[in-house]
Amino acid sequence: MKKITILGSTGSIGTQTLDIVQQYPDQFQVVGLATRNNGELLAQQIKQFRPEIVAICQESQLNTIKDAIASLDYSPILLTGEAGVVEVARYGDSESVVTGIVGCAGLLPTIAAIEAGKDIALANKETLIAGGPVVLPLVEKHGVKLLPADSEHSAIFQCLQGVPKGGLRRIILTASGGAFRDWPVEQLKFVTVEDAIKHPNWSMGRKITVDSATLMNKGLEVIEAHYLFGLEYDKIDIVIHPQSIIHSLIELQDTSVLAQLGWPDMRLPLLYALSWPERIYTDWEPLDLVKAGSFTFREPDHHKYPCMQLAYAAGRSGGAIPAVLNAANEQAVALFLEEKIAFLEIPKLIEMACDRFTNQNTSTPTLEDILEADRWARQEVIKGSQEIAKGNKIMSLT
């Protein structure tokens, strides 16, 4: 019985992880839950899974939870705020922490879990993108396992099992192409929020679905793959694979190519991250190659997806620039979802922030450097959006 904690328990990753726990109660026990603001759903999860410790960032939701669980025959530890989430992450009884918090908000809780000796099922890619220079040395120092729980990096990790050190030559990340893969570039100026959050294959949260539509999600995954698997950026490629059946591939030194296939279901990589190195039997629908039909691939359109190249450039620059890229993207997507900027303004604002930060880059950033870069980039994007609202071109900002 593995004891686990779930950060972001009311989001897409968290609820799918709890689906796994519900299906395999003899394999997993929930010790801790944390979320940002969905007190009603969190209360339901407390009733069902009976965790020892719980945190919600939004303190105003605490009474909702207390009222909902007042009749229970036990009392979990209830915490609030970001500090509460950190306490849940490091809570003593848990063996593995699923990091399902969206964005850079997951960085500090993940660091706390690593320092407490917890293995990490990493579904929060921003932790490595922004904090890789800090997180990876901590993983080595504390001897914990960092296991990818997103589909692409789980696929790479699975393909690498049994590959000797030095055997990896190239990584090929597959991308669905997102909501607008079949739209002409000229139509992107008319994109609405409702258009952008309709993913053709995957069921995900709003922010990551927009990232998929811009292909920033794949660009961020390139940076994550660099940190996880140690390849340089010119050895990490992206291909559009509309069917989302092949989740990623690796090329070995002899040019052999290995791939991991499966239906687009996030439970598969989550289960593997929690059960590795074991394989747990499931009754989920097996892949039927005849039903799946043809597999197609094409090169991404760099003009249509400028965010992808911004991510490659930030990764190659290194230092705190990936943290700037990530924060600028988070803020720009948030503004788009609030209908304060247009879809095509997302990459413009990200590029603006990255360009402005060039002379402030630090080659070996500390945690404080990363957090400051994150704060700075968000402010720059907000200022840039305000200039856009006034009718000014952001290129003219000083």
From Swiss-Prot:
Known catalysed reaction(s)?
2-C-methyl-D-erythritol 4-phosphate + NADP(+) = 1-deoxy-D-xylulose 5-phosphate + NADPH + H(+)
Q: Which UniProt keywords are listed?
A: Isoprene biosynthesis, Manganese, Metal-binding, NADP, Oxidoreductase
Give the protein's cofactors.
Mg(2+); Mn(2+)
Spell out the molecular function terms from Gene Ontology: 1-deoxy-D-xylulose-5-phosphate reductoisomerase activity; manganese ion binding; NADPH binding
Residue positions annotated to bind Mn(2+) are 150, 152, 221
Q: Where are the transmembrane segments?
A: none
* Enzyme Commission number(s) of this protein: 1.1.1.267
Q: Which GO terms describe its biological process?
A: isopentenyl diphosphate biosynthetic process, methylerythritol 4-phosphate pathway involved in terpenoid biosynthetic process
Q: Does the keyword GTP-binding apply?
A: no
Which residues make up the binding site for 1-deoxy-D-xylulose 5-phosphate? 125, 151-152, 176, 199, 212, 217-218, 221
What Pfam families does the record tag this protein with?
DXP_redisom_C, DXP_reductoisom, DXPR_C
What is the role of the protein in this entry? Answer: Catalyzes the NADPH-dependent rearrangement and reduction of 1-deoxy-D-xylulose-5-phosphate (DXP) to 2-C-methyl-D-erythritol 4-phosphate (MEP).
> What is the protein named?
1-deoxy-D-xylulose 5-phosphate reductoisomerase
Give the source lineage, highest ranks first. Answer: Bacteria, Bacillati, Cyanobacteriota, Cyanophyceae, Oscillatoriophycideae
Question: Which gene is the coding source of this polypeptide chain?
Answer: dxr
